[in-house]
Amino acid sequence: MKRADFCIIGLGRFGMQVAHSLKENNFTLVLIDNDQHKTNTAAQEFDHVVCCDGSNLTALAELQLEEFSAVIVGVTNIEASIMICANLRELGQKNIIARAKNEVHNRVLRTMGIREALIPEKIVGKNLVIRLIHGMETEIINLGNDILFVRAPVNNKKLFNRTLGEINIREHTNANLISIMRNGKDVVFPLGPNTQIQPGDVITAVCQLSGVNQYLRYINPNDKNKYKASE
């Protein structure tokens, strides 16, 4: 498998939502579940589906999951989730994003060194996919009606030391800039046409779900953390 691929373990509602969103963005996926009915259903839509017990270290090792860009663990059973994540860590996979059933489960996963532990009620599958594509440091809040509150660092050098009036991000992306976090602590608000973007700035903006990828690609055209879809 290519380095840009993703693996999803657990084909419940959350796992399948993430799978569909990643597929829409032209990523190659491997889907895993220990339920034959779920894998049979998923195989009707996806090319690479495996019926496998993720808590079985030997079975996971055969899939070479350490070669994937990231593995999303979406199982709901806490014990199974912990065992799967432990197996993935042992196999050398560092980029693990796991669904947490509650705050206790969340803390346990983070104690294990899991890169991201997410409670689905706080972040929906589509928002997770945006973060997978553009970098997990991107923060997404769904305001409803497909309107997103997006907080992300700016890495486009062409924007540095230029004013918002000169750049006119809204014209290029239809996003409305709200504030800028500078030096990790100083907040620039309100923003005006003479406000400059500087290296290291983190911008908060409001935009539509349909335009969020365009906006994030504009402020981070060569983001080293952004995964690229398979050719």
Swiss-Prot record:
InterPro entries: NAD(P)-bd_dom_sf, RCK_C, RCK_C_sf, RCK_N, Trk_Ktr_HKT_K-transport
Domain (RCK N-terminal) ranges: 3-119
Disulphides: none
A Pfam family of this chain: TrkA_N
Superkingdom to which the source organism belongs: Bacteria
GO terms, molecular function: monoatomic cation transmembrane transporter activity
Residue ranges constituting the RCK C-terminal domain according to the UniProt record: 134-221
GO biological process: potassium ion transport
Matches recorded under Gene3D superfamilies: NAD(P)-binding Rossmann-like Domain, Regulator of K+ conductance, C-terminal domain
Name this polypeptide is given: Uncharacterized protein MG323 homolog
Organism of this sequence: Mycoplasma pneumoniae (strain ATCC 29342 / M129 / Subtype 1)
Organism taxonomic ancestry: Bacteria, Bacillati, Mycoplasmatota, Mycoplasmoidales, Mycoplasmoidaceae
